[in-house]
Amino acid sequence: MSRVKRGNVAKKRRAKVFKLAKGFKGAHNSLFRTAKQQVLKALRYSYVGRKRKKRDFRRLWITRINAAAHSQGMNYSTFITALKKDNIALNRKMLAQLASNDIKAFQAILETVKN
């Protein structure tokens, strides 16, 4: 059986890691072992971040809706309860966009919910 030299495979493997480590500081983008560790850590952080982003945006929307509802004399929980009771199917993202961009439409929704 003939000898197999792994030069090309090893170079490709390292190049793949260094490509992902581009922009990292210090030895983290130039030494293979540390670059590989940092890439794995960065991939873990990005995975967790994609999950966290959903929670963070939901919190932001709730905060915006609460602030807009408070300015009209109603709190968030009673507003959402009244929306559900009146079968108004607007999600929190839409409500937050209305609260920040189209205040008159948000006030109209509040008035229909109050009555």
Curated annotation (Swiss-Prot):
This is Large ribosomal subunit protein bL20c. The keyword Signal does not apply. Its main location: plastid. Keywords: Chloroplast, Plastid, Ribonucleoprotein, Ribosomal protein, RNA-binding, rRNA-binding. GO terms for biological process: ribosomal large subunit assembly; translation. Belongs to the bacterial ribosomal protein bL20 family. It is found in: Plastid, Chloroplast. GO terms for molecular function: rRNA binding; structural constituent of ribosome. InterPro entries: Ribosomal_bL20 (IPR005813), RIBOSOMAL_L20_CS (IPR049946), Ribosomal_protein_bL20_C (IPR035566). Binds directly to 23S ribosomal RNA and is necessary for the in vitro assembly process of the 50S ribosomal subunit. It is not involved in the protein synthesizing functions of that subunit. PANTHER family: 39S RIBOSOMAL PROTEIN L20. It comes from the Eukaryota. GO terms for cellular component: chloroplast; ribonucleoprotein complex; ribosome.
